Amino acid sequence: MSATPVVSVVVPVRNEAGNIEPLVKEIERALTPEGPFEIIYVNDGSTDATSAELQRLAATRPHLRQIRHRESCGQSAAVRSGVRAARSPVIITLDGDGQNDPAFMPAFLAELRKAGSGCGLVQGQRVGRKDTAFKRW
């Protein structure tokens, strides 16, 4: 990938082999109209086929990269590793289990462009979640 990406998408994962390809395709559908982008999966010590699946997909997708933690360091550390590796100053983080819909990303990018250079963060909140009271706390 030669052009600087418009956005870097950081996806921390651990043992999510079955979710990787569907999420990659959703991200691609959402971001292809936006210009060059990169997807950085941070494999946080997976013990399943996550690494092999990422390697398979990356073979035909120059915009897809994998960073590997040899052992699980936790989601925050995985996000930090991905952010450090990002080539774009604009970074979106997504959970690797498909809970966040990548279709929202163009709207976030539009809000960021509308806000101008003084904006450092655009944030969203999922609605209609079915979490327990403890998780909401």
Model-predicted regions and their roles:
Residues 16-19, 46, 75, 101:
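Donor nucleotide-sugar binding loop of glycosyltransferases
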Residues 36-41, 51-85, 125:
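Conserved donor nucleotide-binding strand/loop of the catalytic core
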Residues 8, 43-46, 68:
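Structural signature of the Rossmann-like NAD(P)-dependent dehydrogenase/reductase core
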Residues 18-22, 48-57:
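Acidic helix N-cap motif at the loop->helix transition within catalytic regions
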Residues 43-52, 98:
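A conserved acidic beta->alpha catalytic loop
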Residues 1-29:
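N-proximal low-complexity "stem/linker" segments adjacent to membrane-targeting elements
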